[in-house]
A protein has these predicted regions:
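Winged-helix/helix-turn-helix nucleic-acid-interaction surface
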Residues: 60, 69-124
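Short recognition helix of helix-turn-helix/winged-helix DNA-binding domains
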Residues: 1-72, 94-95
Length: 124
């Protein structure tokens, strides 16, 4: 991704999702809990969707934004997809394939409504 700064809008989503993730984490082993990196990534994906902007960010870019590693980012993306919070598709742009992440409104609303009942749709 270039050094061009992409503008995105803040939304009230952040606190609601963070609260739901906190409730989900209660009593779970650390390995099953949502992390701050998970919250940061879904927040970025939602912000771009909220701004009607496609989210093509690379793992390297997301690692910089979340102060982690590309491998940790990929694990987080897989987890968010497995819980139905975001979607991934591949799109062609400028003659090359790029991953596009989108916010799954229905899945996220279901999660926020009853985080304790959330289960992964598939293993990461």
């Amino acid at each position: 991704m270039s050094n061009q700064k992409i503008q995105y809008k803040h939304s009230p989503f952040d606190e609601e999702m963070y609260d739901a993730m906190t409730i989900f984490n209660e009593g779970k082993p650390t390995s099953e809990q949502f992390s701050l990196i998970d919250a940061r990534i879904i927040s970025l994906v939602h912000s771009y969707d909220y701004s009607d902007t496609k989210f093509f960010a690379s793992n390297k870019y997301l690692a910089e934004k979340s102060r982690s590693t590309p491998a940790t980012v990929q694990k987080s993306i897989n987890k968010l997809i497995s819980y139905g919070l975001i979607n991934k598709k591949v799109a062609c742009s400028d003659g090359r394939k790029q991953r596009v992440l989108t916010y799954n409104e229905d899945g996220a609303e279901k999660f926020k409504t009853n985080p304790k009942a959330a289960k992964p749709m598939f293993e990461e």
